[in-house]
């Protein structure tokens, strides 16, 4: 992997990009072409690009290496912020209370992690307790054999193993439950402060995950490093936009359909722009749009 960008190399920039990449570089199949060149251009221009994913830290390592991404990323759908070693020389601060407090951090692999959700195995135990209390059977991925894991995720065995090695959330599926049982399970879980997110045929459960808090913590670090506020710009496809756009100051929707067909990605009071997802010059168009200063 290329060396991480460090704080002294942060240059004057009006914006920090937050890009939801799971539909741009999907776990299976071909991704959108040109992302690596786009990443290189952003680096050359000194524009940080934070990637957001529902994948795990280990699962996300290969896509980051392949596309030359050396900036922070938000993984497990808002469970934590991961900072490459040496990226900032600033200690994260919490906004709680009148005076800024040192935010707790973890060392996970090559990264300094700002945890937002409660770390495993707390969510795993809460899931097991809920399943037992309601007599609704669930199967966590960690309980599967390597062959069963690959079959249920649709991933090659090595990638499937990385997918279930999580830091904060637990992946699982329901085992023969009716729709009514599933709804009852989810409702009771939410009452217990569990956060459920669908991921295809799978579900994830976490405690305290929040994309908004991830962006807030990271934006505070960038503002301190730059000594001014850089605008939060969100970039996403329609299916991922609702989880990102409400927390951004400016948004860019990547879609081949008319933006009016995606009302769920509209956010009141936020300037939204649109670029055709599968246009030949997608990333050049994105750069053109980003060059338009508010």
Regions found by a protein language model. Name each.
Residues 8, 12, 32-34, 201-294:
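Mg2+-dependent phosphoryl-transfer enzymes with acidic/Ser/Thr/Gly-rich catalytic loops
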Residues 31-141:
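Active-site phosphate-binding/coordination module
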Residues 48, 195, 250-251:
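Residue-level detector of anion-binding/catalytic polar loops
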Residues 70-76, 158-159, 251-256:
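Short hydrophobic/aromatic-enriched beta-strand-loop microsegments
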Residues 87-92, 153-156, 288-293:
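Short, surface-exposed amphipathic charged segments that create phosphate/polyanion-binding patches used
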Residues 130-233, 239:
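Conserved acidic, metal-coordinating active-site core of Asp-based
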């Amino acid at each position: 992997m290329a060396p991480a960008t460090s704080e002294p190399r942060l240059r004057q920039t009006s914006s920090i990009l937050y890009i939801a990449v799971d539909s741009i570089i999907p776990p299976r199949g071909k991704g959108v072409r040109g992302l690596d060149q786009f990443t290189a251009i952003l680096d050359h221009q000194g524009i940080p690009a934070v990637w957001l994913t529902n994948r795990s830290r280990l699962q996300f390592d290969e896509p980051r290496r392949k596309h030359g991404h050396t900036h922070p990323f938000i993984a497990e759908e808002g469970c934590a912020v991961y900072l490459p070693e040496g990226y900032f020389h600033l200690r994260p601060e919490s906004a709680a209370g009148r005076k800024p407090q040192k935010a707790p951090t973890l060392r996970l692999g090559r990264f300094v992690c700002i945890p937002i959700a409660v770390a495993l195995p707390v969510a795993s135990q809460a899931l097991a307790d809920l399943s037992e209390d309601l007599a609704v059977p669930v199967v966590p991925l960690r309980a599967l054999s390597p062959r069963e894991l690959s079959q249920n995720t649709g991933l090659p065995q090595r990638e499937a193993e990385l997918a279930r090695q999580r830091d904060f959330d637990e992946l699982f599926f329901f085992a023969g439950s009716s729709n009514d049982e599933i709804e009852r399970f989810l409702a009771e879980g939410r009452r217990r402060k569990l956060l459920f997110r669908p991921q295809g045929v799978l579900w994830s459960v976490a405690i305290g995950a929040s994309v908004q808090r991830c962006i807030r913590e990271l934006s505070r670090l960038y503002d301190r490093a730059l000594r001014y506020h850089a605008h939060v710009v969100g970039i996403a496809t329609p299916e991922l936009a609702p989880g990102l756009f409400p927390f951004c100051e400016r948004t860019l929707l990547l879609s081949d359909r008319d933006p009016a067909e995606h009302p769920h990605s509209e956010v009141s009071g936020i300037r939204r722009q649109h670029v055709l997802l599968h246009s030949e010059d997608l990333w050049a168009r994105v750069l053109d749009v980003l060059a338009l200063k508010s």
